[in-house]
Amino acid sequence: MAASSSSGRRRYDVFPSFSGVDVRKTFLSHLIEALDGKSINTFIDHGIERSRTIAPELISAIREARISIVIFSKNYASSTWCLNELVEIHKCFNDLGQMVIPVFYDVDPSEVRKQTGEFGKVFEKTCEVSKDKQPGDQKQRWVQALTDIANIAGEDLLNGPNEAHMVEKISNDVSNKLITRSKCFDDFVGIEAHIEAIKSVLCLESKEARMVGIWGQSGIGKSTIGRALFSQLSIQFPLRAFLTYKSTSGSDVSGMKLSWEKELLSEILGQKDIKIEHFGVVEQRLKHKKVLILLDDVDNLEFLKTLVGKAEWFGSGSRIIVITQDRQFLKAHDIDLVYEVKLPSQGLALTMLCRSAFGKDSPPDDFKELAFEVAKLAGHLPLGLNVLGSSLRRRGKKEWMEMMPRLRNGLNGDIMKTLRVSYDRLHQKDQDMFLCIACLFNGFEVSYVKDLLEDNVGLTMLSEKSLIRITPDGHIEMHNLLEKLGREIDRAKSKGNPGKRQFLTNFEDIHEVVTEKTGTETLLGIRLPFEEYFSTRPLLIDKESFKGMRNLQYLKIGDWSDGGQPQSLVYLPLKLRLLDWDDCPLKSLPSTFKAEYLVNLIMKYSKLEKLWEGTLPLGSLKKMNLLCSKNLKEIPDLSNARNLEELDLEGCESLVTLPSSIQNAIKLRKLHCSGVILIDLKSLEGMCNLEYLSVDCSRVEGTQGIVYFPSKLRLLLWNNCPLKRLHSNFKVEYLVKLRMENSDLEKLWDGTQPLGRLKQMFLRGSKYLKEIPDLSLAINLEEVDICKCESLVTFPSSMQNAIKLIYLDISDCKKLESFPTDLNLESLEYLNLTGCPNLRNFPAIKMGCSDVDFPEGRNEIVVEDCFWNKNLPAGLDYLDCLMRCMPCEFRPEYLVFLNVRCYKHEKLWEGIQSLGSLEEMDLSESENLTEIPDLSKATNLKHLYLNNCKSLVTLPSTIGNLQKLVRLEMKECTGLEVLPTDVNLSSLETLDLSGCSSLRTFPLISKSIKWLYLENTAIEEILDLSKATKLESLILNNCKSLVTLPSTIGNLQNLRRLYMKRCTGLEVLPTDVNLSSLGILDLSGCSSLRTFPLISTNIVWLYLENTAIGEVPCCIEDFTRLRVLLMYCCQRLKNISPNIFRLRSLMFADFTDCRGVIKALSDATVVATMEDSVSCVPLSENIEYTCERFWGELYGDGDWDLGTEYFSFRNCFKLDRDARELILRSCFKPVALPGGEIPKYFTYRAYGDSLTVTLPRSSLSQSFLRFKACLVVDPLSEGKGFYRYLEVNFGFNGKQYQKSFLEDEELEFCKTDHLFFCSFKFESEMTFNDVEFKFCCSNRIKECGVRLMYVSQETEYNQQTTRSKKRMRMTSGTSEEYINLAGDQIVADTGLAALNMELSLGEGEASSSTSLEGEALSVDYMITKEQDEDIPFLDPVSDGTWRSFYSAE
């Protein structure tokens, strides 16, 4: 078959090329009729006059057809018209990918292909006659077309049954080739995978009539998949119908069935007036017809029986597809071929959501987390994804965030409407079970829920209707949207009164009902999810909280309080089946509680001293869990607990005995008594069904006389067992796991025991154990741990039968001398022999071991030759293997991973080894190794580690054969002097030569390298790296001999990180390059570097600490992506361009201890248009401290959480006045600089760390209040407490807010008093009120001040005009200007001159409280909207948190 046709509009489905004399009235007419019957549009020539050249309309028809059918017949080659058509078809086949079907009608395909025989004679005659009338090369084009088209697989009448059969086959083939997916389904993500899977079940090539079911939960997309499938298959089935079942009511069953049959036949036969008067017409009319029937949303078995009773009702090749949510309908109708529609994967679900919400396959970067959460809230259900996505379409991020609480807590109405249909179809009892699972038991074990609900049928019904799923490990899984549906249905019944619901699952509702005692008889279950156990609010339960809940059956809560809970209850509902109360404060259950219906009693970590008095009717009780109830002194009488299956008393420290009545619990299977100091275990002698016993205590008394253990024990856990040996009557036939660690056992038992089920044996730390029992019958043993069995001398040879052994730990068996030989442990994955100093032979074992730890403290290990055979496993790790040399018979041809770290010899082996399987080799720490082995045949090696091989001088040239090598590490190879030249390791991405202190030159050994580490080497210059165009990271730290970088570094346009820390010889960097991808540049400690680096304007993180740079130049404004600039301890730095304040992205700038800084070149334009984005973070003088703090991983991308922003000029004592003023006016984020006096324009000031301000009315008309604060901090004195950050606490209208700014520990690096500035805002409540400020840090705050700020609504031009018209008196150099202060006018900040503004109000004295009366006192300065966006909000704090602290002073 030819390649598929190119996309685009086509006028015709089929173009036929034929000889009219041979086939027009016979074969062709039949074929056109068959194609027309399948609605296939075929070109018909309608008597176009034929000549030697084909007509233009024919050329157009050929090109606009999707398929050409070429009918080769006896006289086809007699027509130049036909041959020229064929040339055009051949061209479309090659150029347009048109599909071509050749048909050989009474001719031999080989004669056509080779132009021989009768066909060849006709062709040659045509060529001879027309040679003068056709172009010279026309014959060659005819020959090529005949040869190529005849070579395509087609239909041959001579080899077929008959002409009719061939017509049908060709028409079907054409139909299949024309099938394309309907564009209506293009937006349904993943639908093609479903369709292909269903097609494989349908087996369309089969002639039998077949019924197939499509099954899945509501909203999963079954109907959509069905419609898409129907659309694709329709062209193959002229007789077809798609019917959706509609529920009907009424008693006329016969009429309903006749109506169904009429609808089906009308759809299939296309007749609207069909009359049906009796049943069975469907079978009669369609018995011999090939049909496609799809029945959707089937919820009635009679519907199926009436329309598609049996597959035999329909003709050969028919396909019946039934879509339903109920698996039982399919079973009842004997439909065994079922396709289950499952939830899409996380990736597909996200794509579905994004198609609906964003119209594309992935979310915008800033919507990723929200999109993931919405997809999760939809439970990956296609219906939910589509509905939620549509509801969020074309909404901004803020709107998404505002809608999230509603999506988390509720259920969309459209989703609920669709899912509710499934619930409404359930019988009442099944509806009750659905609600019970949705509200209480989603995610629980099936057996657990069956016991509580006493229903084995209901769960099966819900599962068959796709309302729940039973997981492979036996848990109930209900989709989260169905769970929300159930809870919404229950909530709706109560009409707003939680006490009248059936189930309570929300803390607030439970709190209300329990605290206010509003529970009613309707309430069946209370369950608080575990995540709400730790609510900050206590659940106040008193003695009568449960008194109104007469019918409560399920109670699962926890204790959240810090005290005040009752130690006793008056009443517990008598119908309780589940009592699950962790940390219960009760000392005992109420005496009125009878426990008659109780199935599960779970009271872990309780304060119980006893459960109840006397004997209660416990016939329903199956599980009792009192884990870690440390005050429990006795277990109640269990005489009536004949159905008890599990009893957990682990950690009940006060319990001393088990009641003799426990022997009546004949169904007890699990008993946990670890940590219980029992007097004796004789009461266990009647426990014939006990399978799980956990004792785990060394102080069990009366154990020496034990003569009986339950015979069906599967798991015995008895750590610290005081017995010397188990009794001879101990039965191990059913034993699966034996754990007796740190026991006093000397031996387990005598003789051979039937250990066929035993899988685990843990005897670790049994220091008296002298021998391991016979394990010859332990053929399923998988794990053995006898670590620290110090008395063990030999290991049993019977271990050889443990062919499934995976884990064997014999470490620290100090007396172990020998190990059995000839063990066949092919499954072994872990073997530990460390700490066995007397072991004189290594086990000669065949094994598939992936991890071997060898004995320590020996100079030589004798290894049997058979160990080193071709079965040597991949991943073998010879860690700390102190061999002198590898065994002479070592054959590593199957070795995948070779780790021989700390190898002691000078070479690994002699000659060339076959290493074709080797992928990783580690010879690190082999200090004596002078050469690595010949690796010329290790062509699959990907990772080679030679770290700390100090004697290694060079690498062999054969390393050039390692074309798959991805990573080469040679760190601290101090003897390495040269690398081989003229090699190109084409796959090498990481090369680490750091610490190779003798390496002076670096030849480029790979053009594919991405990470290159050359730090701490003796390299003097970097050679041409222009060919390393993939390089992303270049690390040259501590290359002290390096003076510069080559200009060819400009070719490295993928370089993202360049680290040159402490390259003390580096003087200059190239200036004529721009590394477009460079994000991190670290030149810290380059003490000879005098000029600001200009090798990239895209730098994000720039480290220039301890350099000799003298100026931050004006071109800093071009660094538009810069976020971090560290220049502390730059003693030669004198000038900083004010253009640094233009960088909106800059978040950190630190000039601490730049004591030579004199000024920041003032520029009135810069000040007037300032867009505050400049901030900094404080750092210490210690460079290493900075590295640790900012880098996380040494060479990461630097994408850190920058947290607090900060602009630091600490200890910059030479800053002139203009520079200080410019810095202060430019920042509304934290700033630090030397100083001991708050600027006078801070209108509210006070001594100490707090002040109270009465706000002017004009400020309360703002939506938000904005403040700038200033503190004077004495770094040499201690404050009133320890704080990690400098904190602002703010009280307003009875509420408290808080914000943390710079890290407090940075203050210790200040040498004198410093000023700290910060800005913040919060939402105004439009109420005139006092506000309180309190500032906290670990050092003494001498003085504090605040001022109000306002956001201007004017343009920059209007602001400047307004400024020029205002009149005020201002001191600025020698000029004076006057401004009137009246009414609500606000003085705009006009740059540097405004800093010296003298308010006519006077300065006054600072005090602990400031109240400035009068509207004129609202004078302050304007900020732009852009500046306001950078000001952080204060965070609200919980009631009392700050107030209590504030009052404590």
Swiss-Prot record:
<keyword id="KW-0433">Leucine-rich repeat</keyword>
<dbReference type="InterPro" id="IPR027417">
    <property type="entry name" value="P-loop_NTPase"/>
</dbReference>
<dbReference type="Pfam" id="PF07725">
    <property type="entry name" value="LRR_3"/>
</dbReference>
<dbReference type="InterPro" id="IPR032675">
    <property type="entry name" value="LRR_dom_sf"/>
</dbReference>
<dbReference type="InterPro" id="IPR035897">
    <property type="entry name" value="Toll_tir_struct_dom_sf"/>
</dbReference>
<feature type="repeat" description="LRR 11">
    <location>
        <begin position="826"/>
        <end position="849"/>
    </location>
</feature>
<dbReference type="GO" id="GO:0050832">
    <property type="term" value="P:defense response to fungus"/>
</dbReference>
<dbReference type="InterPro" id="IPR044974">
    <property type="entry name" value="Disease_R_plants"/>
</dbReference>
<feature type="domain" description="TIR">
    <location>
        <begin position="10"/>
        <end position="178"/>
    </location>
</feature>
<feature type="repeat" description="LRR 12">
    <location>
        <begin position="915"/>
        <end position="939"/>
    </location>
</feature>
<dbReference type="Pfam" id="PF00931">
    <property type="entry name" value="NB-ARC"/>
</dbReference>
<dbReference type="Pfam" id="PF23282">
    <property type="entry name" value="WHD_ROQ1"/>
</dbReference>
<feature type="repeat" description="LRR 5">
    <location>
        <begin position="644"/>
        <end position="665"/>
    </location>
</feature>
<feature type="repeat" description="LRR 3">
    <location>
        <begin position="597"/>
        <end position="618"/>
    </location>
</feature>
<dbReference type="InterPro" id="IPR045344">
    <property type="entry name" value="C-JID"/>
</dbReference>
<dbReference type="GO" id="GO:0061809">
    <property type="term" value="F:NAD+ nucleosidase activity, cyclic ADP-ribose generating"/>
</dbReference>
<dbReference type="Pfam" id="PF00560">
    <property type="entry name" value="LRR_1"/>
</dbReference>
<feature type="repeat" description="LRR 17">
    <location>
        <begin position="1053"/>
        <end position="1077"/>
    </location>
</feature>
<dbReference type="InterPro" id="IPR002182">
    <property type="entry name" value="NB-ARC"/>
</dbReference>
<dbReference type="InterPro" id="IPR042197">
    <property type="entry name" value="Apaf_helical"/>
</dbReference>
<feature type="repeat" description="LRR 16">
    <location>
        <begin position="1028"/>
        <end position="1052"/>
    </location>
</feature>
<dbReference type="InterPro" id="IPR001611">
    <property type="entry name" value="Leu-rich_rpt"/>
</dbReference>
<feature type="repeat" description="LRR 2">
    <location>
        <begin position="574"/>
        <end position="595"/>
    </location>
</feature>
<dbReference type="InterPro" id="IPR011713">
    <property type="entry name" value="Leu-rich_rpt_3"/>
</dbReference>
<keyword id="KW-0677">Repeat</keyword>
<keyword id="KW-0547">Nucleotide-binding</keyword>
<feature type="active site">
    <location>
        <position position="85"/>
    </location>
</feature>
<dbReference type="GO" id="GO:0043531">
    <property type="term" value="F:ADP binding"/>
</dbReference>
<feature type="repeat" description="LRR 9">
    <location>
        <begin position="756"/>
        <end position="779"/>
    </location>
</feature>
<feature type="repeat" description="LRR 7">
    <location>
        <begin position="712"/>
        <end position="732"/>
    </location>
</feature>
<feature type="repeat" description="LRR 13">
    <location>
        <begin position="941"/>
        <end position="962"/>
    </location>
</feature>
<feature type="repeat" description="LRR 8">
    <location>
        <begin position="733"/>
        <end position="755"/>
    </location>
</feature>
<feature type="repeat" description="LRR 1">
    <location>
        <begin position="549"/>
        <end position="573"/>
    </location>
</feature>
<dbReference type="GO" id="GO:0007165">
    <property type="term" value="P:signal transduction"/>
</dbReference>
<feature type="repeat" description="LRR 4">
    <location>
        <begin position="619"/>
        <end position="642"/>
    </location>
</feature>
<dbReference type="GO" id="GO:0006952">
    <property type="term" value="P:defense response"/>
</dbReference>
<comment type="subunit">
    <text>Interacts with RSH1.</text>
</comment>
<keyword id="KW-0067">ATP-binding</keyword>
<feature type="repeat" description="LRR 15">
    <location>
        <begin position="986"/>
        <end position="1011"/>
    </location>
</feature>
<feature type="repeat" description="LRR 14">
    <location>
        <begin position="963"/>
        <end position="985"/>
    </location>
</feature>
<dbReference type="Pfam" id="PF20160">
    <property type="entry name" value="C-JID"/>
</dbReference>
<feature type="repeat" description="LRR 19">
    <location>
        <begin position="1120"/>
        <end position="1143"/>
    </location>
</feature>
